[in-house]
Curated annotation (Swiss-Prot):
Descriptive protein name: Acyl-[acyl-carrier-protein]--UDP-N-acetylglucosamine O-acyltransferase
GO MF assignments: acyl-[acyl-carrier-protein]-UDP-N-acetylglucosamine O-acyltransferase activity
Enzyme kind, highest EC tier: transferase
Chemical reaction(s) catalysed: a (3R)-hydroxyacyl-[ACP] + UDP-N-acetyl-alpha-D-glucosamine = a UDP-3-O-[(3R)-3-hydroxyacyl]-N-acetyl-alpha-D-glucosamine + holo-[ACP]
SUBUNIT field: Homotrimer.
Function text: Involved in the biosynthesis of lipid A, a phosphorylated glycolipid that anchors the lipopolysaccharide to the outer membrane of the cell.
Compartment(s): Cytoplasm
Family annotation (Gene3D superfamilies): Hexapeptide repeat proteins, Udp N-acetylglucosamine O-acyltransferase, C-terminal domain
Claim: Amino-acid biosynthesis is one of the keywords in the record: no
UniProt pathway annotation: Glycolipid biosynthesis; lipid IV(A) biosynthesis; lipid IV(A) from (3R)-3-hydroxytetradecanoyl-[acyl-carrier-protein] and UDP-N-acetyl-alpha-D-glucosamine: step 1/6
GO CC annotation terms, alphabetical: cytoplasm; membrane
The organism of origin for this protein: Burkholderia mallei (strain ATCC 23344)
GO process terms (BP): lipid A biosynthetic process
């Protein structure tokens, strides 16, 4: 029995694994590739130069691979690449990249993308990320693995959200959130280390303690950013379980272009 509903439109050139399921009135464009066991909900549109991996579930009325909302876009064949085992719920929009950046929007593996989320052009979303309903990512946003973005939050262009961090609901984020940090508010401010998330991910008590010390250096000790960087670099060489985590935080802060929330 066919897994493609008779009312669905599969344009010539589209490459679908034989196990892909496509629901009623969905449209799959001619430059789309979809891997095994992925399901496309009714009325969804998958278009553009889009590659989708295996075991993904795309909900009803999703728009995946649409043109970038960038006035500089001139129909260049930019791309969207989605990994495996992602859940993308109803009315989500994910756009392809632009030539002004890398030309590709990416979504990793095992992500949970809730209803009405927007992932703009050139975004780079890692793996195991949760984007809650109505979270809105502007263009060029980077989100690290295991990060969580609360519902109805807005993220400014080019902002980075570090791995294992959490942005509370209804927040406005205009600068980078370092890894492991909780932020919330309009505009978003730091509110401690994501201790519960780190415990769930298997971080040791010593590593969590080191990250708490790093947070105090960065936010609680009335240090300038340059002074804090020096002390954080020293902490990253303490010889404990938390060295690697603190080092990743230091590297993130050092590489920030928009500045970190502070």
């Amino acid at each position: 029995m066919s897994r493609i509903h008779p009312t669905a439109i599969i344009e010539p050139g589209a490459q679908l694994h034989e196990t892909v399921e496509v629901g009623p009135y969905a449209i799959v464009g001619s430059h789309v590739t979809i891997g095994a066991r992925t399901t496309i909900g009714s009325h969804s549109v998958i278009e553009g130069h889009t590659t989708i991996g295996e075991d993904n579930r795309i909900g009803h009325y999703a728009s995946v691979g649409g043109r970038p909302q960038d006035m500089k876009y001139k129909d260049e064949p930019t791309r969207l690449v989605i990994g495996d085992r992602n859940t993308i719920r109803e009315f989500t929009t994910i756009h392809t990249g632009t030539v002004q950046d890398t030309g590709v929007t990416t979504l990793g593996d095992d992500n949970w993308i809730m209803a009405y989320v927007h992932i703009g052009h050139d975004c780079r979303v890692g793996s195991h990320v949760i984007l809650s309903s109505n979270a809105q990512m502007a263009g060029h946003v980077e989100i690290g693995d295991w990060a969580i973005v609360g519902g109805m939050s807005g993220v400014h262009q080019f902002v980075r959200i570090g791995a294992h961090s959490m942005l509370g609901g209804a927040s406005a984020l205009v600068q980078d959130i370092p890894p492991f940090v909780i932020a919330a508010g309009n505009k978003a401010e730091p509110h401690g280390i994501n201790v519960e998330g780190l415990r769930r991910r298997g971080f040791s008590p010593d590593a969590i303690s080191a990250l708490r010390s790093a947070y105090r250096i960065l936010y609680k000790n009335s240090l300038s950013l340059e002074e804090a960087k020096v002390q954080l670099s020293e902490l990253a060489q303490a010889g404990g379980d938390g060295d690697a985590a603190v080092k990743s935080l230091v590297d993130f802060v050092e590489s920030s272009q928009r500045g970190i929330i502070r």
